[in-house]
Amino acid sequence: EPENFIDKKLRARWRSYGITPMLNDKQVNVYHGLSNELPFNIQQFKGKKIVTIHDLIFLSYQQLYPFIDRKIYNKKFRNACDAADVIIAISKETKRDIEKHYFIPESKIKVVYQSCDEIYYRELQQHVKDKVQEKYKLPPEYLLYVGTIEERKNLLTLVKALKQTKEIPLVVVGNKKTYFNKVMEYITANQLQHR
């Protein structure tokens, strides 16, 4: 945590520059940037540096990101990949993208798949399931999509695939972006509302 007033008020600046001296002062052995970036001055850190890269989708699908966002992400992600001793990629596809876009040697990148909290593995009691099913008027079986409803998540492709399958209902949970309208237009035009 930032220790002085300015760093507390300007957390982004602290994460980018202020944290490194503190890591050295506290004799930290390993620093792990969990979300695609490391401080810009991390080279001054005396310990080992690890970064987890979740995706480089802003490079693969540039049309989905404003120019300035792409420039900022690219600078942060490239800096992190260059500075890290080890890069954790959350999928083989992310690993390939890092190698392709940043020319990082394969030996520096390790694929570690993400998991989820143990709470999601617990079996719910039947009365809880029944209550949720009744509240949301859910069918006995369905395909569940969870994620922001935006173009890069590719919900429209899933909806198009439904048209070619047996009667599997789709339940969508997520925040709507303008892309939602495009998905709904397709659903209406292809009479998939009942799905």
Give residue spans per PLM region.
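Carbohydrate transferase catalytic cores enriched for Leloir-type hexosyltransferases
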Residues: E1-R195
